[in-house]
Amino acid sequence: MKRCICVLLVSTVLFGGCMNRNRVANTFVQVEKALAVAPDSAMRLLKDIPAKSLGNQAMRARYALLYIDAAERAQLNENTDSLLRIAWRYYRKHPQEMQNRCRTLYYMAHSKLRQGDKPGALRLFLEAEENNDSLDNPRDRGMLYLSIGDVYRGELNFVRAYRYY
């Protein structure tokens, strides 16, 4: 009898954890859909996710990257450096997640630009471009090339800027 109760209790806890993880994953899918048309709604969905439900590193990294993306698209001037570190800590070790790795590099480069570090930003943009060639997301690629061109234009290197525009 005790064994049966223990098994039932353990299975309930495990099942509840899986349900919570699925709920968060479904919220992430909704956020990705809302990013293009309503980034402020995506931000609200992300803020409604309790921190306890982001159990593993992969979920925390995905949350961080989605939050950064939503803040950028909603044109909020939030300091997202700590979230960038969370995302980078995970994605630099997982090359199979190349698209998220490139997006993290892109946002890290923008953070460097905001700090006034153009050479550091350019290095990160070019690293993202190097890895981005195998991807077929036209929006991300276009934003990356536009940013690289802007940095070169700011340095008065119009020949290289023209190549990226």
Show where each model-derived region lies:
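A "functional boundary" signal
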Residues: 5-13, 17-165
